[in-house]
Design a protein with these regions (language model features):
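Bacterial N-terminal signal peptides that target proteins for export
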Residues: 1-8
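Sec/Tat signal peptide C-region and signal peptidase I cleavage site
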Residues: 18-23
Length: 107
């Protein structure tokens, strides 16, 4: 039983570490990068250096947990211009988008 628990724990960790991008096809990834540049860029700046919204550059996001960013994208920020994207994007797509933003992809 103990051996099974260790194996199961290792499997769960491996699943958690599997990149999200493996599940999204390249066409959808390209669409998300377009959305990032044009939709997110309309408030956060086309080069993501800020504007109506805060900067979305990797160096500005180091201290932000990915889960915080995912929740912000999904649910918006009440009292701010940040709209919710839940219903338009899946959680998996938002996770991929947050990873791309944190890597500086599309800059």
């Amino acid at each position: 039983m103990r051996k099974t628990s260790k194996w199961l724990f290792a499997l769960i960790i491996m699943i958690q570490l599997t990149p999200v991008s493996a599940a999204l096809d390249t066409a959808r990834q390209a669409e998300l990068l377009y959305l990032l540049k044009h939709d997110c860029g309309s408030c956060h700046g086309m080069t993501r250096k800020g504007g109506l919204g805060p900067p979305l550059l990797p160096e500005n996001l180091r201290d932000r947990p990915p889960m915080f960013m995912e929740n912000t994208v999904l649910d918006g920020r009440p009292g701010t211009p940040m709209p919710p994207w839940r219903g338009l994007l899946t959680e998996q797509e938002v996770r991929w988008l947050v990873e791309a933003i944190r890597r500086g992809e599309g800059l």
